[in-house]
A protein has these predicted regions:
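A contiguous pocket-lining binding segment that forms or flanks enzyme active sites
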Residues: 112-167
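Juxtamembrane boundary at the C-terminal end of a transmembrane helix
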Residues: 210-225
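Membrane-water interface of transmembrane alpha-helices
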Residues: 14-20, 82-97, 156-164, 170-171
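Membrane-proximal soluble regions of multi-pass membrane proteins
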Residues: 159-196
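Portal/gating segments that form or line small-molecule/metal binding sites
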Residues: 41-112, 116
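Membrane-interface helix-loop junction between the first two transmembrane segments
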Residues: 16-35
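Hydrophobic transmembrane alpha-helical segments in integral membrane proteins
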Residues: 1-13
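Loop-to-transmembrane boundary segments
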Residues: 107-119, 183-205
Length: 225
């Protein structure tokens, strides 16, 4: 369990440091591309450590499984995969390296109308779904670490973009929201379903089906019985 605790701590500290006041100084020495490269390598190593430590960690019960958790986790997982499919590569200035999208025009369309952080919400919902279904210490460390860094990532990205882009970011943020559907419900934007490509919905659904199949392969079925 020591390795699991250290892996979770490394993951959280890495992401908080990368989003904190040390980032500009490190990026100044390595260059922005160099910083992103090092951070990506460390993140990959941290994720591998988390997974390997989780697989060998002893099962320590913290609480019994939440009654009906599977009925909550399944829809959360489906939404998470849809957000991931719609968010990745969809032209969002909150993604790494996409700052220049705000230079020409506000890219407020599609999933960005719903939330400006679709991919991070995908990871957050994925982690939350697994927290509901797992009440053991190793599960809480793994999924809790991912949930915390995903939620903190939204805040830190917004702050970084605001510092870098100023009024361009303020105009973008005024018409979008961190919380899904908040800008639409507040009347700051409108939902246009026709801007959500059906093929992305198909990809999200396929990923969800693949995840269900993989759970069966490892002997852990998420389907309510």
């Amino acid at each position: 369990m020591v390795s699991m605790i250290l892996a979770a701590a490394f993951w959280v500290v890495l992401h908080f440091v990368a989003a904190g006041p040390l980032r500009p100084r490190v990026a100044a020495r390595l260059g922005e591309q160099g910083f992103r490269g090092v951070f990506s390598l460390l993140s990959a190593a941290g994720l591998a450590w988390l997974i390997l430590a989780y697989r060998v960690a002893p099962y320590v019960t913290l609480w019994q499984a939440v009654p009906g958790a599977a009925y909550i986790a399944m829809p959360l997982m489906f939404v998470a995969f849809l957000l991931l499919a719609f968010g990745i590569g969809a032209g969002n200035p909150t993604l790494a390296g996409a700052d220049m999208l705000l230079k020409d025009q506000l890219p407020i369309r599609g999933i960005t109308r719903i939330t400006r952080h679709p991919a991070l919400w995908a990871f957050a919902l994925w982690a939350l779904a697994h927290l509901l279904a797992n009440g053991d210490l190793a599960g809480v460390l793994l999924f809790g670490a991912i949930l915390v860094t995903a939620l903190n990532g939204m805040v830190s990205i917004d702050r970084k973009r605001h510092r870098a882009l100023g009024q361009g970011w303020e105009a973008f943020a005024a018409q979008t929201s961190r919380l899904p559907f908040a800008a639409i419900l507040a009347g700051r934007n409108t939902l246009h379903v026709e801007e959500l490509p059906p093929w992305r919905a198909a990809v999200g659904t396929a990923l969800f089906a693949l995840a269900l199949w993989l759970h069966g392969v490892i002997g852990v079925s998420p389907i309510p019985s």
